[in-house]
């Protein structure tokens, strides 16, 4: 069995020199957490299996700023790096990989133009193409109400999962399960799956969402949104069937250091690199 991965996520505000890491609740209520290069170095030294940088400012004008951050990071950080936010064209993939990233994640641009996935995977390889899916529950009274959505029975009732774009500011009506399947068919190598309902809440991942996506694609799924303690990460693997768990605030604010989380998982017989 492949080892599960622990992935710190750095949401980067690049409107200031060198950038700063922030964290919100349900994509709002922003707190500042530190310098991206310094935090990435800290997490690498603690044993992070991968590090995700998300540019929340996501503008072409600041592409060079993110590239600078990545170039400085990889001078001392030797673990896989994924960059997301503002990845709109194949040339953006190329620029970030040239700066030192190993993967690029895109959400809005792929939904607006799904062929981007085909073109990017052909140009840089599927292993470098991560699709971010930011999903929110939409409840229905009757599972037969909609033929166009993948309906899931949860503890709170029947629902489907709606894909959002533009950092959660706009909903598309696109079913997240069907979209994940299409992304894999087009050449995506991984899904970065965030629950908008759980983001920053620390009440645990949306396990129904994670499990449903994981069972419908064969590529790795990264669970994101809602982790508050090591047990939540354990649940993402044991119940949610995720391949990796992404977390932010529990690491940024030193609530649960990465070594503590990994030792907890090891004691629970989860295959993990120590």
From Swiss-Prot:
- What is this enzyme's class at the first EC digit? lyase
**Matching InterPro entries:** Aldolase_TIM, His_biosynth, HisF, IGPS_HisA/HisF, RibuloseP-bd_barrel
Q: Does the keyword rRNA-binding apply?
A: no
Its pathway, per UniProt, is: Amino-acid biosynthesis; L-histidine biosynthesis; L-histidine from 5-phospho-alpha-D-ribose 1-diphosphate: step 5/9
Q: Which residues cross the membrane?
A: none
Give the reactions, separated by semicolons, that this protein catalyses: 5-[(5-phospho-1-deoxy-D-ribulos-1-ylimino)methylamino]-1-(5-phospho-beta-D-ribosyl)imidazole-4-carboxamide + L-glutamine = D-erythro-1-(imidazol-4-yl)glycerol 3-phosphate + 5-amino-1-(5-phospho-beta-D-ribosyl)imidazole-4-carboxamide + L-glutamate + H(+)
Supply the Pfam families for this chain. His_biosynth (PF00977)
**Location relative to the cell:** Cytoplasm
Q: What is its main location?
A: cytoplasm
Family statement drawn from the similarity comment of this UniProt entry:
Belongs to the HisA/HisF family.
Against NCBIfam families, the record matches this protein to:
hisF (TIGR00735)
Note the HAMAP family from the entry: HisF
How does this protein assemble?
Heterodimer of HisH and HisF.
Provide the protein name: Imidazole glycerol phosphate synthase subunit HisF
The source organism is: Methanosphaera stadtmanae (strain ATCC 43021 / DSM 3091 / JCM 11832 / MCB-3)
**Top-level taxonomy:** Archaea, Methanobacteriati, Methanobacteriota, Methanomada group, Methanobacteria
Instruction: Write the gene name.
Output: hisF
